[in-house]
Amino acid sequence: MSMSSIPSSSQSGKLYGWVERIGNKVPHPFLLFIYLIIVLMVTTAILSAFGVSAKNPTDGTPVVVKNLLSVEGLHWFLPNVIKNFSGFAPLGAILALVLGAGLAERVGLLPALMVKMASHVNARYASYMVLFIAFFSHISSDAALVIMPPMGALIFLAVGRHPVAGLLAAIAGVGCGFTANLLIVTTDVLLSGISTEAAAAFNPQMHVSVIDNWYFMASSVVVLTIVGGLITDKIIEPRLGQWQGNSDEKLQTLTESQRFGLRIAGVVSLLFIAAIALMVIPQNGILRDPINHTVMPSPFIKGIVPLIILFFFVVSLAYGIATRTIRRQADLPHLMIEPMKEMAGFIVMVFPLAQFVAMFNWSNMGKFIAVGLTDILESSGLSGIPAFVGLALLSSFLCMFIASGSAIWSILAPIFVPMFMLLGFHPAFAQILFRIADSSVLPLAPVSPFVPLFLGFLQRYKPDAKLGTYYSLVLPYPLIFLVVWLLMLLAWYLVGLPIGPGIYPRLS
């Protein structure tokens, strides 16, 4: 059935329909960012002409907007157009991951693996399985945002459910719940370092450890898995109707060749993991930090994405040879070319997106907006629960316009960490508030390079889907996740539970 007009007689259905209609009137993402660049250029020219600035509450220095339409702006822009595009960090990582994951899909490894997994899962609980796997996949950082959504769709296909529902459930897990982790991951390392630096302004002895949010974030995985599963089953899938894809899109029973291939792939996977473990677990492992011999940070953590790509290549090659989907050397590049063709639209969209992000950063607009809004919130005199909500809403708003969560926290932490400490709260508690807000709205952020990617995934199953279709379908997850997560944190605070080992919301 068509998803461009999703049936519902309820008020919520009318809301989603309105969001879809409005969203579908938004120009193609390529044109959208062209228009945003024009608006940004005019805005910087006006603010610069009138000498508008914002006062940085941290050191009192003015934050001035730089004019993109000035001679200085032109001199910066022309030599950096190609650099802005080729140096756009997510582009290389996404394309490289698609090479690996695309090969795994083309040789038949991922579909076979999904059928194998689905054979042990009741279709009724598929939503919860997809979400839980998505949360666990955060150990691979941004790679999870590329790998998990297509896998979620395949899992739902395997159990006879709508693939778009599986796709959206996976996006919710890797996107809305990006910072909810069972394990300590790179996000913990990055944010805790920023928080420690910010706390030093108030108390030089204060240290925010990588495990200071662990109890709360690990518990969040359980809560959000349940919440996300209910959203998928009760809200999303009923709106999609019955999946009416072609018969060849449905995953079939595994053949003997596929079973043999999975066994070979499993053995190779274990050997690969064992080899990496031997380079990481020993104190003198070659993938540990060469000076401090730590795992976090280390070449292993910094190189996690290349290692995942290599893992895909090695295991896919083993499966392909075992099942004879790879018969000769020439098959390998051919199989990798096909998934890259599907990324052409994404690459085109990234060009203006990369220019917009670079221009936004160079002009100081991001810092100007952040500092201005932060100053308003700080001067409002909020404390306690209103301060919690204020920081969360401010963070959510900024995350819609600044793609890097660490960049936003670098701006907010120097103001809010000392402010929360003055109110008697641990800096790790302020950090949790930011993490909740940052994660929840990730699938909605128009400047995120992953939104066009998610739209491309959706168009595999709904070719005529537009940005409005995507937003109307994914919208319940960010809204409900944000509310439930904040309520969970409020309950955690009121009960007085530790948010990490020996760390409580309030300073002792």
From Swiss-Prot:
**Chief location:** membrane
- Activity regulation (record text): Completely inhibited by 100 nM sodium azide and by the proton ionophore carbonyl cyanide m-chlorophenylhydrazone (CCCP). Is also strongly inhibited by 100 mM potassium fluoride.
Give a GO cellular-component term: plasma membrane
For biological process, the GO terms are: amino acid transport; p-aminobenzoyl-glutamate transmembrane transport; p-aminobenzoyl-glutamate transport
* Coiled-coil intervals: none
Q: Which domain of life is it from?
A: Bacteria
- List the effects observed when the gene is inactivated: Cells lacking this gene loss the p-aminobenzoyl-glutamate utilization phenotype.
The reaction(s) this protein catalyses? N-(4-aminobenzoyl)-L-glutamate(in) + H(+)(in) = N-(4-aminobenzoyl)-L-glutamate(out) + H(+)(out)
Q: What does this protein do?
A: Essential for aminobenzoyl-glutamate utilization. It catalyzes the concentration-dependent uptake of p-aminobenzoyl-glutamate (PABA-GLU) into the cell and allows accumulation of PABA-GLU to a concentration enabling AbgAB to catalyze cleavage into p-aminobenzoate and glutamate. It also seems to increase the sensitivity to low levels of aminobenzoyl-glutamate. May actually serve physiologically as a transporter for some other molecule, perhaps a dipeptide, and that it transports p-aminobenzoyl-glutamate as a secondary activity. The physiological role of abgABT should be clarified.
Something else known? It is suggested that in wild-type strain abgT would normally be cryptic or not expressed under conditions of growth on minimal medium. Altering the expression of abgT from its wild-type context appears to be the mechanism for obtaining the growth phenotype.
Indicate what this protein is called per its UniProt record: p-aminobenzoyl-glutamate transport protein
Q: Which organism is it from?
A: Escherichia coli (strain K12)
